[in-house]
Amino acid sequence: MKGVILAGGASCGTLLRPLGIRLPLTAGKGYSFLRRLRTLPRRPIHLGDIKVAVTPFARGLRVAGTMELSGNNETLRRSRAQAIARGAAQYFDGWDELEPGSNCREPEELWVGRRPLTPDGLPILDRVHPFENLFIATGHSMLGVTLAPATGKALAGYALSGQRPELLEPFRLRRFASTS
């Protein structure tokens, strides 16, 4: 057996709606921006008390955090990024100094990512009935990139063999009775 695996994150609900499939999915928005600093840390750091991750890049420090529950959209609230910046500032010398060539103390390259969330916090990893060859992988929340290899391996095996691995049992779509 062969199939298609839909791994569209927070957009899976929108993508499946024309097929008559409703998913209990919403988005938790995470904010990310670039901050230019004179001195960067040598490796990524998780600032656990403020729930912010920072990653050094050649162009500056990538700062990411928060979980905003405001719907499945890409509306960006600058005040959220500014709050993250205020929290992270206490950890870095020179946060408020301007990097040469920069004319801005505001967050640069600000964007929002939509993390797919299910009501019970578990992802949906299942065949999409009534379609024999359509499978879904979504709802990983903040762990999508982390869990992608294991999810891909498990669902690819399912799609190729047609046999649901016992490992995937807790992640069935039908656990949300009114949606499947």
Where are these regions (language model features)?
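Active-site substrate-recognition segment that forms the wall
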Residues: 1-132
